[in-house]
């Protein structure tokens, strides 16, 4: 996916809260929106080179979104809204298994009963529901999710597990950086999520991880990654 904007370099100073940070842009301190609910403690550190996207709405509170951060071995996609757009493209191209067979329709933000899922996929002979999670934390060779406790993520897994006997269900982890080789749940951070993920897999929910490639022009599919539960 090519960016429809030109990333603007800045230097990160500090987070004011979960969604607001301070950067130095062209010699001036500026407040920016951080479109990611994670802690990002290992990524958004003082002095980190980051890249911004200028907003098109003149009435918005913060003029810029913090989209990318430069780690020693890789750029990191901080914007957690973009991975769903990337996932939709991968689904439509038949890259994400087990949805690689003939797809009639991919619909975003769909409800099933009381549950809301990132995607509903209509295959010729079956319906599928998918949740997408963006992964930014890496320790050694491992990409880890989550980087903060996520009761909402646990609920998503329980909902998918409940549907798995009647529908194709999957959790897709998009690794938003290039310096990881294996995905596993972050059981130290959120043992409830790790346990729910294992139970979902045992019930037949597909657990998939795909690594992305990044540069200042866009984000691209790299390869499927090993998942260790």
From Swiss-Prot:
The gene is sfsA. NCBIfam families: sfsA. It comes from Carboxydothermus hydrogenoformans (strain ATCC BAA-161 / DSM 6008 / Z-2901). Belongs to the SfsA family. InterPro entries: SfsA (IPR005224), SfsA_C (IPR040452), SfsA_N (IPR041465). It comes from the Bacteria. This is Sugar fermentation stimulation protein homolog. Gene3D superfamilies: 2.40.50.580, 3.40.1350.60. It holds the Pfam family SfsA.
């Amino acid at each position: 996916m090519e960016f429809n904007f030109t990333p603007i370099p800045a230097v990160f100073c500090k987070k004011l809260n979960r969604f607001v940070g301070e950067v130095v842009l062209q010699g001036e301190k500026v407040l920016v929106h951080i479109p990611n609910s994670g802690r990002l403690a290992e990524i958004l550190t003082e002095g980190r080179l980051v890249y911004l996207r200028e907003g098109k709405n003149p009435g918005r509170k913060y003029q810029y979104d913090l989209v990318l951060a430069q780690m020693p071995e890789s750029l990191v996609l901080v914007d957690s809204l973009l991975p769903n757009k990337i996932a939709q493209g991968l689904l439509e191209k038949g890259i994400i298994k087990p949805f690689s067979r003939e797809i009639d329709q991919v619909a975003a933000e769909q409800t099933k009963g009381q549950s809301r899922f990132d995607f509903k996929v209509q295959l010729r002979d079956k319906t599928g529901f998918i949740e997408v999670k963006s992964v930014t934390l890496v320790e050694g060779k491992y990409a880890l999710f989550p980087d903060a406790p996520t009761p909402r993520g646990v609920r998503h897994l329980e909902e998918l597990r409940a549907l798995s006997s009647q529908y194709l269900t999957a959790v897709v982890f998009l690794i938003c950086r290039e310096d990881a080789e294996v995905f596993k749940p972050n059981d130290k951070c959120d043992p409830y999520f790790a346990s729910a993920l294992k139970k979902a897999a045992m019930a037949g929910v597909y657990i998939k991880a795909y690594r992305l490639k990044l540069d200042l022009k866009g984000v691209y599919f790299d390869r499927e990654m090993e998942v260790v539960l």
